[in-house]
């Protein structure tokens, strides 16, 4: 399958989640494209990486995913992954140093809780030790002589969690509902909390590079 290929094949899955300054942080709404009827959170650790490919820190991330769109065709990955408010990061970037190292990332457990207004609760865990590719190998696949990021990048590392708990009835599986509160946490990286909305109803992304340079 296409998922097995990127899991154990020669090339990792690397894609653009959002443009610089396009992610949302702690407490913000996260967005689902209105066309999606089957979607899910993806609790992940994300690395802060310099333009030279040096990993300097880590944070938590939610790689909001439209499973029905991605499942239709691999060519729709951009539509499944990159929408308004579909990339969440936070609550802070913890820099590597005394008390926190690359080994902590590799051994980390990332917990997920989805709590719906309908009383539904979903819990899960993603263990970094079970991911088939090392953080360093993913960074090398993303940045290097073959592809540059002059201002650095934040790289989501993937997840081992896939929601299977039925929500609407036996065999119907999981999908988000508007108003779900998603909490992603790890002991050394805190907790990232967001509320699910439609991407068309989340605040539009208006602050880009031009506005940043104007403010400077």
Where are these regions (language model features)?
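Catalytic-pocket segment enriched in acidic/His residues
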Residues: 67-216
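Active-site microenvironments in enzyme catalytic cores
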Residues: 1-116
């Amino acid at each position: 399958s296409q998922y097995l290929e990127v899991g154990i094949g020669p090339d990792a899955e690397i894609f653009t989640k959002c443009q610089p300054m396009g992610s949302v942080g702690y407490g913000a709404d996260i967005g689902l494209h209105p066309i999606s009827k089957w979607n899910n959170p993806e609790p992940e650790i994300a690395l802060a990486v310099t333009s030279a490919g040096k990993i300097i820190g880590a944070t938590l991330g939610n790689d909001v995913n439209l499973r029905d769109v991605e499942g239709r065709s691999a060519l729709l990955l951009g539509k499944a992954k990159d929408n308004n408010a579909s990339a969440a990061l936070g609550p802070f970037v913890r820099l590597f140093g005394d008390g926190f190292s690359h080994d902590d990332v590799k051994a980390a457990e990332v917990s997920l809780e989805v709590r719906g207004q309908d009383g539904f609760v979903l819990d899960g865990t993603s263990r970094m030790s079970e991911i088939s590719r090392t953080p360093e190998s993913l960074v090398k696949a993303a940045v290097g002589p073959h592809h540059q990021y002059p201002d650095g990048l934040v790289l989501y590392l993937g997840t081992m969690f896939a929601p299977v708990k039925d929500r609407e009835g036996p065999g119907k599986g999981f999908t988000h509902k508007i108003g779900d509160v998603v909490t992603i946490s790890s002991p050394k990286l805190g907790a990232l909390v967001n509320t699910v909305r439609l991407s068309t109803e989340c605040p539009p992304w208006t602050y880009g590079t031009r506005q940043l340079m104007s403010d400077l």
